[in-house]
Curated annotation (Swiss-Prot):
Naturally occurring in which organism (per UniProt): Acinetobacter baumannii (strain ACICU)
UniProt-listed Gene3D superfamilies: Vaccinia Virus protein VP39
InterPro entries found in the cross-reference section: SAM-dependent_MTases_sf, UbiG_MeTrfase
This enzyme's EC code(s): 2.1.1.222, 2.1.1.64
SUPFAM superfamilies in the cross-refs: S-adenosyl-L-methionine-dependent methyltransferases
Protein name: Ubiquinone biosynthesis O-methyltransferase
Length: 237
């Protein structure tokens, strides 16, 4: 287990909260609130999800994965926490969403099994929870087909992101449990771009995800000071 690109403490945090994953008033409320934004952003840039084979890396309980399946994609969600995966399977069964599967497997291992098998790969709100983000990016590049799309999201590392993503979200607004994020694992856009280039992906777009605590509204804008999303493609034939 020590050789895997996994932080066991990170896995344990989300395992402990697994039963609340689909409760829109729980600690996962922010994920439910941002999901329509990120789903539409991915859908538009991928040229539509319907009929495509999609992999969601670090899927947790399946909020994004299931919503992509509802758009008509054939989805595999992978995670290293078994409890969230069990919640995802149960929810899909209850909602009769049949075009989705879940597996407990490291993305690097799946890349050895299924290289070039996916039209779209998503890895959202996960990069800042692993020891080696570059390894995740490379595995995603391996898994996507030539011409396919890979999407990432994470949190910038700077004083503003510390103030907003940790002090604000975890301590002041209490949107997230204390200890959800480790500032030192946040990833600057320049670092993300470096890993993307090294993996052989082409960076197409970065956009910021913003939140107003007064209006409780989320929106997308060019500023990537705190939360941001990335669209890449795998060029070649």
């Amino acid at each position: 287990m020590s050789q895997l690109n996994v932080d066991l403490q990170e896995i344990a945090k989300f395992e402990a909260l697994a039963a609340k994953w689909w409760d829109q008033h729980s600690e996962f409320r922010p994920l439910h609130q941002i999901n329509p934004l990120r789903l539409n952003w991915i859908d538009e840039r991928a040229g539509g999800l319907a009929g495509k084979k999609v992999l969601d890396v670090g899927c947790g309980g399946g909020i994004l994965a299931e919503s992509m399946a509802r758009r008509g994609a054939d989805v595999l969600g992978i995670d290293m926490g078994e409890a969230p995966l069990a919640i995802g399977r149960l929810h899909a069964q209850q909602e009769n969403v049949q075009n989705i599967e879940y597996r407990q497997i490291p993305v690097e291992e799946l890349a050895q099994e299924q290289a070039g098998q996916y039209d779209v790969v998503t890895c959202m709100e996960m990069m800042e929870h692993v020891p080696d983000p570059a390894s995740i990016v490379k595995a995603c590049q391996t898994l996507v087909k030539p011409g396919g799309h890979v999407f990432f999201s994470t949190i910038n590392r700077n004083p503003k992101s510390y103030l907003f993503a940790i002090i604000g979200a975890e301590y002041v607004l209490r949107m997230l449990p204390k200890g959800t994020h480790d500032y030192h694992k946040f990833i600057r856009p320049s670092e993300m771009a470096h890993d993307i280039r090294n993996a052989g992906l082409t960076l197409k777009e970065m956009t910021g995800l913003h939140y107003n605590p007064i209006t409780k509204r989320y929106w997308l804008a060019p500023n990537v000071d705190v939360n941001y999303m990335v669209h890449t493609i795998k060029t070649g034939v």
